[in-house]
Amino acid sequence: MAAWGRRRLGPGSGGGGARERVSLSATDCYIVHEIYNGENAQDQFEYELEQALEAQYKYIVIEPTRIGDETARWITVGNCLHKTTVLAGTACLFTPLALPLDYSHYISLPAGVLSLACCTLYGISWQFDPCCKYQVEYDAYRLSRLPLHTLTSSTPVVLVRKDDLHRKRLHNTIALAALVYCVKKIYELCAV
């Protein structure tokens, strides 16, 4: 019981409080190095990133600043669309429970349309992009486990592969429920 709350240290750590550096296999981490070889270096970086995404490495470290920033922004926009779909769809579905029925459709219908629009845009632009399986890693402990000491860049972008099956199911289920609600509500408003 006294060991609760303590981190177990690996062999050879001596119990001195230092965390063990976990070695990763070659299939776990890929580094897109910032090495300029001629005029087509940027294209080479993009090609390496595409190959790493398609190979489904657990971690991808992107040294080139421009490509790293573009990739991080692309992932952020996809996350924003996903969250907007879920939150707007939830607002669409729960607004009729919180507001009087005479006024709830003024909020629920626009929220439902927003949810459907974001879901459609996500489905067209992000759903089949291999980049949507990755998230930008910010956790200092997880970053300390990666071989970042070999990099030449001081601000690399680190991507970690995450299973997004449940996230997509939630996303699509809420958007579909919002669609059903909107169609039903529009039918009721037009029939009156």
From Swiss-Prot:
GO cellular component: mitochondrial inner membrane
Keyword check for rRNA processing: no
UniProtKB keywords: Membrane, Mitochondrion, Mitochondrion inner membrane, Transmembrane, Transmembrane helix
BP-aspect Gene Ontology terms: inner mitochondrial membrane organization; mitochondrion organization
Cell location: Mitochondrion inner membrane
Pfam family, any one: Mito_morph_reg
Disordered: annotated segments: 1-20
Top-level lineage group: Eukaryota
Membrane topology (UniProt): Multi-pass membrane protein
Annotated transmembrane regions: 84-100, 107-124
Function: Plays a role in mitochondrial morphogenesis.
Family annotation (PANTHER family): PROTEIN PM1, TRANSMEMBRANE PROTEIN 11, MITOCHONDRIAL
Family: Belongs to the TMEM11 family.
Assembly: Associates with the mitochondrial contact site and cristae organizing system (MICOS) complex, composed of at least MICOS10/MIC10, CHCHD3/MIC19, CHCHD6/MIC25, APOOL/MIC27, IMMT/MIC60, APOO/MIC23/MIC26 and QIL1/MIC13. This complex was also known under the names MINOS or MitOS complex. The MICOS complex associates with mitochondrial outer membrane proteins SAMM50, MTX1, MTX2 and DNAJC11, mitochondrial inner membrane protein TMEM11 and with HSPA9. Interacts with IMMT/MIC60.
Protein name: Transmembrane protein 11, mitochondrial
Record organism: Bos taurus
Encoding gene per record: TMEM11
